[in-house]
Amino acid sequence: MRAPYQTLTILYKKENEQIKFAIFYRNSHPIWQFVSGGGEDNETPIETVVREIKEETSLIIDKSEIRQLDSRTTIPVLNITGKYTWGDSVFVVPEYTFAVELKNYDIKLSNEHKEYKWVEYREAMEKLRYDSNKTALWELNERLI
């Protein structure tokens, strides 16, 4: 069963003193975003991050590589599942944010995404649609510089 939370994970790499961020173009919606998804059954948010990265990119990440960010938001349930999955009184669920520095860049996209790009901070901010993605990116960038 779908757990009542969402995760957002920023994948980044450092090359020649530059930081680049992986953004993904969804097949189902014409938007750029980071790796995202909801928990399943009794997964912790960290376990969800590991699974979502594997599902969306084919990369295997160890839990120790995941950095939790302070940025959080809530998302309307109807935007996630299309119905009130967790009862009539649950209208929004939390979205927790994370970051992972990649050493292996061999991303193989799932059918959820049409393409991905490695971009610098400014371009990512221009392409991302959701404010929650932009806030998490700003926080991570500030922590890295």
Language model features by range: what are they?
Residues 1-21, 41:
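Conserved N-terminal beta-strand and adjoining loop/helix that marks the start
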Residues 11-13, 25, 101-102:
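Residue-level signal for short segments within beta-strands and strand-turn junctions
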Residues 16-17, 28-30, 40-41, 72-77, ...:
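Short, charged/polar surface micro-motifs in flexible loops or helix N-caps
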Residues 18-61:
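Conserved Nudix-box catalytic region and its N-terminal flanking loop in Nudix hydrolases
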Residues 33, 92, 118:
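Short aromatic/basic micro-patch
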Residues 95-138:
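NUDIX/MutT-family hydrolases
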Residues 139-144:
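C-terminal alpha-helix
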